[in-house]
């Protein structure tokens, strides 16, 4: 018999397998929308965010590269705003440091312009075209002929975000559970 049956003898409305950022964010958002639902999050490791979530680059993406009008584009732009607001509200360290996308050769300009147009169409905040001088002002060790400045992107530790989701689920929704080593 699986271990979780001996730990929990309850019925749940929703069971989510995986205690990474996707599983925990899903459980948290579902509980916010449906506070009476009993949700069980099962994580096989000793702690949440032990795999991909805890080992990625931590980039807060802007929505720059996605096809305009796509769900990915909308969800990325909206999700970035929501993530940054969540991080501020819960005092999770993050840095909205921006990024520079650089064309180092004339042959790259057409693609860079396509990326810029995607960013505008997707509602990426503050995106602007920049020249070689501005590239150097932002990032002195970067060389390019033209570029894009995307000030709304940044970095965050998604393991910290996941741990906060697990903490909030346990504190706010006592009918729901996050169980590790299951």
Name each region found by the language model.
Residues 6-22, 40:
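Beta1/beta-strand and adjacent pyrophosphate-binding region of the FAD-binding site
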Residues 22, 26, 47:
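Conserved Rossmann-like nucleotide-cofactor binding loop
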Residues 27, 31, 168-170:
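Gly/Ala-rich phosphate-binding loop of Rossmann-like dinucleotide-binding domains
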Residues 31-55:
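Glycine-rich FAD pyrophosphate-binding loop
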Residues 35-36, 88, 140, 174:
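Proline-centered flexible-loop/turn and helix-kink motifs
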Residues 58-138, 144:
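Dinucleotide-binding Rossmann-like beta1-alpha1 core, especially the glycine-rich loop
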Residues 148-182:
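Helical element adjacent to the flavin cofactor pocket in flavoenzyme catalytic cores
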């Amino acid at each position: 018999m699986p271990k979780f049956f001996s730990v929990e003898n309850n019925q749940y409305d929703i069971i989510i397998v995986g205690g990474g950022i996707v599983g925990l964010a899903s459980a948290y958002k579902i509980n916010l929308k449906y506070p009476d639902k009993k949700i069980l999050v099962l994580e096989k490791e000793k702690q949440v965010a032990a795999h991909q979530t805890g080992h990625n680059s931590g980039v807060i993406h802007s929505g720059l590269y996605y096809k305009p009008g796509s769900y990915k584009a909308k969800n990325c732009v909206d999700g970035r705003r929501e993530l940054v607001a969540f991080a501020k509200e819960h005092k999770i360290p993050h840095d909205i440091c921006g990024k520079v996308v650089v064309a180092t050769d004339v042959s790259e300009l057409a693609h860079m312009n396509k990326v810029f147009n995607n960013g505008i169409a997707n509602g990426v905040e503050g995106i602007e075209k920049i020249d070689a001088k501005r590239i150097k002002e932002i990032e002195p060790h970067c060389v390019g002929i033209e570029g894009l400045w995307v000030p709304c992107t940044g970095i965050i530790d998604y393991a910290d975000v996941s741990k906060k989701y697990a903490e909030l689920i346990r504190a706010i929704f006592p009918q729901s559970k996050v169980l590790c080593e299951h």
